[in-house]
Amino acid sequence: MAKGRVADRSPTEMLHSTPAGDRAVRTQGSAAPGSKDHLNEKPCAEAGSARTSLLILVSIFSCAAFVMFLVYKNFPQLSEEERVNMKVPRDMDDAKALGKVLSKYKDTFYVQVLVAYFATYIFLQTFAIPGSIFLSILSGFLYPFPLALFLVCLCSGLGASFCYMLSYLVGRPVVYKYLTEKAVKWSQQVERHREHLINYIIFLRITPFLPNWFINITSPVINVPLKVFFIGTFLGVAPPSFVAIKAGTTLHQLTTAGEAVSWSSVFILMVLALLSILPAIFQKQLKQKFE
């Protein structure tokens, strides 16, 4: 069984247990698993494909950027000032200016605005580009709370899943070369929580222990199933998004993104994070008791 096979491997072997990684492990020779030489062999094996991976990544990014260009071209005619404000927000002033433009056209061009928001959010998430936090806040300004929350969770889940697939396709050389030690440590945690992986992913999305971009690009390398990854992300981003969307209802009163988070909201997020991991803790204790 696959589970038994993973249990017999060293943490480093678990890191490389993708289909491509398994083929490479079988041809690695006499290096001892878990040794420094063993850790270095994989980057060497993947080095030849780094250039190909980069070309594929650039091609995919170019296609995605072209789609974003088409979405922008399909937008209603804008004034010169409005065109200047139609950009990915980098601070709260940008978010306010963009919100002002989108709210002006939202009622008349509802579908175009919704598609533009949806596509932009997924684009940022897919390529790990900063700015999605401001789009989360902006959703609370533009849409009713239930729709805004569903929209942000769906965009986050899809965007992170696209990033996952992109990493599976072309990102492994980067993980093997630059993130090996961190990925090995996380692979150990994943194996420890394998029976409750959805709860663990939810916990990680709520808490700031691991950056989202790191979770996205290393998950396919350490055998986190895509279905589990999507569900855990969709549910896990809901509590932080709740805070951001709620803040978006008072967008014009905010001056920085930090003002969207209060001590009460941090406390609530910590409680929800603990609740998400409790089933795994209780089941583990019951299992040990009956054994």
UniProtKB/Swiss-Prot annotation:
<keyword id="KW-0597">Phosphoprotein</keyword>
<feature type="compositionally biased region" description="Basic and acidic residues">
    <location>
        <begin position="1"/>
        <end position="11"/>
    </location>
</feature>
<dbReference type="Pfam" id="PF09335">
    <property type="entry name" value="VTT_dom"/>
</dbReference>
<dbReference type="InterPro" id="IPR045014">
    <property type="entry name" value="TM41A/B"/>
</dbReference>
<dbReference type="InterPro" id="IPR032816">
    <property type="entry name" value="VTT_dom"/>
</dbReference>
<keyword id="KW-1133">Transmembrane helix</keyword>
<keyword id="KW-0256">Endoplasmic reticulum</keyword>
<comment type="subunit">
    <text>Interacts with VMP1. Interacts with COPA, COPB1, VDAC1 and ERLIN2. Interacts with ATG2A. Interacts with SURF4.</text>
</comment>
<feature type="transmembrane region" description="Helical">
    <location>
        <begin position="197"/>
        <end position="217"/>
    </location>
</feature>
<keyword id="KW-0072">Autophagy</keyword>
<dbReference type="GO" id="GO:0044233">
    <property type="term" value="C:mitochondria-associated endoplasmic reticulum membrane contact site"/>
</dbReference>
<keyword id="KW-0813">Transport</keyword>
<feature type="transmembrane region" description="Helical">
    <location>
        <begin position="109"/>
        <end position="129"/>
    </location>
</feature>
<comment type="similarity">
    <text>Belongs to the TMEM41 family.</text>
</comment>
<feature type="modified residue" description="Phosphoserine">
    <location>
        <position position="35"/>
    </location>
</feature>
<comment type="function">
    <text>Phospholipid scramblase involved in lipid homeostasis and membrane dynamics processes. Has phospholipid scramblase activity toward cholesterol and phosphatidylserine, as well as phosphatidylethanolamine and phosphatidylcholine. Required for autophagosome formation: participates in early stages of autophagosome biogenesis at the endoplasmic reticulum (ER) membrane by reequilibrating the leaflets of the ER as lipids are extracted by ATG2 (ATG2A or ATG2B) to mediate autophagosome assembly.</text>
</comment>
<feature type="transmembrane region" description="Helical">
    <location>
        <begin position="147"/>
        <end position="169"/>
    </location>
</feature>
<dbReference type="GO" id="GO:0005789">
    <property type="term" value="C:endoplasmic reticulum membrane"/>
</dbReference>
<keyword id="KW-0445">Lipid transport</keyword>
<keyword id="KW-0524">Neurogenesis</keyword>
<feature type="transmembrane region" description="Helical">
    <location>
        <begin position="225"/>
        <end position="245"/>
    </location>
</feature>
<feature type="modified residue" description="Phosphothreonine">
    <location>
        <position position="18"/>
    </location>
</feature>
<protein>
    <recommendedName>
        <fullName>Transmembrane protein 41B</fullName>
    </recommendedName>
</protein>
<dbReference type="GO" id="GO:0044830">
    <property type="term" value="P:modulation by host of viral RNA genome replication"/>
</dbReference>
<keyword id="KW-0812">Transmembrane</keyword>
<feature type="transmembrane region" description="Helical">
    <location>
        <begin position="52"/>
        <end position="72"/>
    </location>
</feature>
<dbReference type="GO" id="GO:0000045">
    <property type="term" value="P:autophagosome assembly"/>
</dbReference>
<dbReference type="GO" id="GO:0017128">
    <property type="term" value="F:phospholipid scramblase activity"/>
</dbReference>
<keyword id="KW-0472">Membrane</keyword>
<dbReference type="GO" id="GO:0032365">
    <property type="term" value="P:intracellular lipid transport"/>
</dbReference>
<dbReference type="GO" id="GO:0007399">
    <property type="term" value="P:nervous system development"/>
</dbReference>
<feature type="region of interest" description="VTT domain; required for its function in autophagy">
    <location>
        <begin position="140"/>
        <end position="251"/>
    </location>
</feature>
<feature type="transmembrane region" description="Helical">
    <location>
        <begin position="262"/>
        <end position="282"/>
    </location>
</feature>
<feature type="region of interest" description="Disordered">
    <location>
        <begin position="1"/>
        <end position="43"/>
    </location>
</feature>
